[in-house]
Amino acid sequence: MFLINLLLLIVPVLLAVAFLTLIERKILGYMQFRKGPNIVGPHGLLQPIADAVKLFIKEPLRPLTSSIYMFILAPILALSLALTIWVPLPMPLPLIDLNLGLLFILSVSGLSVYSILWSGWASNSKYALTGALRAVAQTISYEVTLAIILLSIMLINGSFTLTTLNLTQEFMWLVVPTWPLMLMWFISTLAETNRAPFDLTEGESELVSGFNVEYAAGPFAMFFLAEYANIIIMNALTVILFFGTYHLIFLPELSTTNFMVKTMLLTSLFLWVRASYPRFRYDQLMHLLWKNFLPITLVTCLWYIMFPTMLSGTPPQM
C-alpha cells in the first residue's frame, strides 16, 4: 500500500516537471516574440515526451578520464534527493507526517549540492569543476539565510511540523506580517535552485554548460528533472510557509486545488524572472547575501524572539 502511495506521489511530480519544461519554453518564446515549441503534437503539447524518448534512447557517453562510479551516481543522487523532499509536504495530507518536517526539507536540499560537486569532480573537466565549485559556494551561502528565515517562521508557528502551518494561517497568511522575509526567501530560493539571475553554475557564456557539460542522454535528463523538481518543491514550500493552503474557509475540500494554483503562479514568476533579468556577477551574488540578506534576516529573527518575550507579562486585552 505504501508503495502505491509513493508512486501516486512520484509519477505526478515527474509529469509536472515534464510539462514545466514545455511551459517555460512557451513563456520564454512569447516573451521573445516567437512561438516556442508548436510542431510535436497539438500546440507542441507532446514536446516533453519526445524530448524524454530522445534522451533516454541515446547512448550515455562519458569521458575516458572520468571517475565512472561517481560520474553515474551523481545524477541518480540528484533525482532521488529531489523526489525525497516531497515526502513530508502536506497536500493537504503528507505521505509521512514528520515532526521535524522543515528540518528534513532543509537538510535534504543541502545534500543536493553533493551531486553537483560529484558530477563536476568526476567529469575531470575544468569547466565542470568550476561550475561545481561555484554551486557549492552559492548553495552553502544561501542555505544560511533560508535557515534563519525558517527559524523566524517557526517562532511564529510554534512548531517544526508543516501541517500546523495550515492551522496558523487559517485567518491570515503569514506573508502579511512577514513580507520582507517572504521577498528574501523568494530570492534565496532562486539562488538555491541555481535559476536565473543566479545561474552561475551553468553560465553558458563562460562555462559552456557548467557542472553537467560532460553529461549526455539519460544522466543529463536526470539532472534536468532534478533541477525542475527542485523548482516546484521550493515554490510549494513558499506556498505552505507564507500563503496558507487552508485559506478557503467555506470550501476546505478545495485546499489541494488552492495549493496547486498558488504553486503554479509562483513557478510562473520564476520563469518570468528568467526572461527578464541578466545573470548576476559572482561577487555581486555573494555581496547580496553576506552584506544585505544575512544582517536583515538576523535582525528580524531577533525581533520575532524579542516581541513575544516583551509582551509575555502583559494581561490579555479585551
Curated annotation (Swiss-Prot):
One of its GO terms (biological process) is aerobic respiration. The chain crosses the membrane at residues 3-23, 68-88, 100-120, 144-164, 171-191, 231-251, 254-276, 293-313. It is an enzyme of class 7 (translocase). Pfam families: NADHdh (PF00146). One of its GO terms (cellular component) is mitochondrial inner membrane. InterPro entries: NADH_UbQ_OxRdtase_su1/FPO (IPR001694), NADH_UbQ_OxRdtase_su1_CS (IPR018086). Its EC number is 7.1.1.2. One of its GO terms (molecular function) is NADH dehydrogenase (ubiquinone) activity. Its main location: mitochondrion. Keywords: Electron transport, Membrane, Mitochondrion, Mitochondrion inner membrane, NAD, Respiratory chain, Translocase, Transmembrane, Transmembrane helix, Transport, Ubiquinone. It is found in: Mitochondrion inner membrane. It catalyses: a ubiquinone + NADH + 5 H(+)(in) = a ubiquinol + NAD(+) + 4 H(+)(out). It is a multi-pass membrane protein. Core subunit of the mitochondrial membrane respiratory chain NADH dehydrogenase (Complex I) that is believed to belong to the minimal assembly required for catalysis. Complex I functions in the transfer of electrons from NADH to the respiratory chain. The immediate electron acceptor for the enzyme is believed to be ubiquinone. Belongs to the complex I subunit 1 family. This is NADH-ubiquinone oxidoreductase chain 1. It comes from Tachyglossus aculeatus aculeatus.
